[in-house]
A protein has these predicted regions:
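Iron-sulfur (Fe-S) cluster-binding modules
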Residues: 1-4, 131, 135-154
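Short pre-active-site segment immediately N-terminal to redox-active cysteine/selenocysteine motifs
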Residues: 8, 18, 37-38, 48, ...
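Iron-sulfur cluster-binding cysteine motifs and their immediate structural context
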Residues: 14-29, 44-61, 85-103, 123-141
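Hydrophobic face of beta-strands forming the core of extended beta-sheets/solenoids
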Residues: 5, 34-35, 75-76, 86, ...
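Intrinsically disordered, low-complexity Ser/Thr-rich linker and spacer segments
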Residues: 56-73, 144-145
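Tandem repeat domain/solenoid detector
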Residues: 36, 52, 71, 77-78
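Short linker/helix segments within small regulatory modules
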Residues: 28-34, 69, 102-117
Length: 154
């Protein structure tokens, strides 16, 4: 079920700017709306909302997360096939391909080059052919749980 925005929205627009699938609309200083058919339930909008007015599909409130505490994508070079699916899907162009020397052989692999821009939306994980190649992790290195599960918040 899609996330939704409560009436106490201040219209700051940050949720719309950070949404990886552009499913949030609204004017400055007016209530914003999430298009449920487009929402991927990633929770990124709620993790940026300064007034905590975004709720998941079960009606659970989401809360703002400090930028230094947000999970971001990391590539396990040894598992990356170089398929470029993650590069193509990343809405914020955080991932690029680079040449990596693995055991004396050169391969094109993904690299998260703009870590501060990554919102942890997990689109890269969803399209990765090898689920171990790219993982969204907390700053301490622990794998972040899937926030599309009910009751999980960034």
């Amino acid at each position: 079920m899609a996330f939704f925005i409560a009436d106490d929205c201040i219209g700051c627009t940050i949720c719309a700017k950070k949404c990886p699938v552009h499913c949030i609309s609204g004017n400055v200083q007016e209530l914003h709306v999430i298009e449920p058919e487009l929402c991927i339930d990633c929770g990124v909008c709620g993790s940026y909302c300064p007034v905590n007015c975004i709720y998941d599909g079960d009606g659970m409130q989401t809360f703002k997360v400090d930028p230094k505490d947000r999970p971001i994508a990391e590539v396990n070079v040894g598992n990356c096939t170089g398929c470029i699916a993650c590069v193509e899907i990343c809405p914020f162009e955080c991932i690029e391909m680079k040449t990596e020397n693995i055991d004396g052989r050169f391969f094109e692999v993904a690299d998260v080059v703009h870590k501060k821009v990554c919102v942890g939306c997990r689109l890269c994980e969803m399209v990765c052919s090898d689920k171990e190649a790219i993982v969204v992790r907390w700053p301490d290195g622990a794998a972040a749980p899937d926030f599309r599960n009910p009751g999980y918040y960034l």
